[in-house]
């Protein structure tokens, strides 16, 4: 894949970590193997990965360790912009700045409009 270096933000629950249910949250389910393999390949090609999740504190630490130990993914940033982005914009916004957001809850405006019909 030749697309220049991209920054990819990926959600944890329901995206990287699947087979969970609300009743058992914050249970750590199984890895989304296809996504994990694709992300690892992209990182090997030089792309930047950011873990982008609502988890915080100990639950966030568990998720980061799960990704590292169980999936072999070491994120370039966790719930934060990378240093190059902070430098470029002269600060750090609350919104993660990236080229792609991967999230089980997301949708494009076109999909959202169709949901309203």
Identify what each model region corresponds to.
Residues 1-117:
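HAD-like aspartate-dependent phosphatase fold
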């Amino acid at each position: 894949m030749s697309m220049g270096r991209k920054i990819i933000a990926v959600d944890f629950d329901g995206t990287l970590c699947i087979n969970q249910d609300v009743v058992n949250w914050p249970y750590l389910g199984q890895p989304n193997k296809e996504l994990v393999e694709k992300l690892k390949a992209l990182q090997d090609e030089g792309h930047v990965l950011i873990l982008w999740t609502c988890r915080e504190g100990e639950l966030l630490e568990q998720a980061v360790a799960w990704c590292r130990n169980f999936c072999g993914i070491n994120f370039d940033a966790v719930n934060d912009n990378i240093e190059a982005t902070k430098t470029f914009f002269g600060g750090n916004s609350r919104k993660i700045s990236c080229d792609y957001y991967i999230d089980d809850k997301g949708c494009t405006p076109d999909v959202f409009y169709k949901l309203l019909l």
